């Protein structure tokens, strides 16, 4: 999930367009770093 973080935009550092990325992994992707890295590389290459 990627979203604009309103706390960063409206107060604090006041950085418009600041993004927050949340991720969760389960099963093989939680336990095998190479498998997780491979899948994330495919996603990032959209």
UniProtKB/Swiss-Prot annotation:
Source organism superkingdom: Bacteria
InterPro entries assigned: GTP-CH-I_C/QueF (IPR043133), GTP_CycHdrlase_I (IPR001474), GTP_CycHdrlase_I_dom (IPR020602)
| Positions of Zn(2+) binding | 7
GO terms under cellular component = cytoplasm
Example GO molecular function term? GTP binding
Q: Which family does it belong to?
A: Belongs to the GTP cyclohydrolase I family.
Provide the assembly information: Homomer.
Name listed for the protein in its UniProt record: GTP cyclohydrolase 1
Which source organism? Bacillus pumilus (Bacillus mesentericus)
Taxonomic lineage is: Bacteria, Bacillati, Bacillota, Bacilli, Bacillales
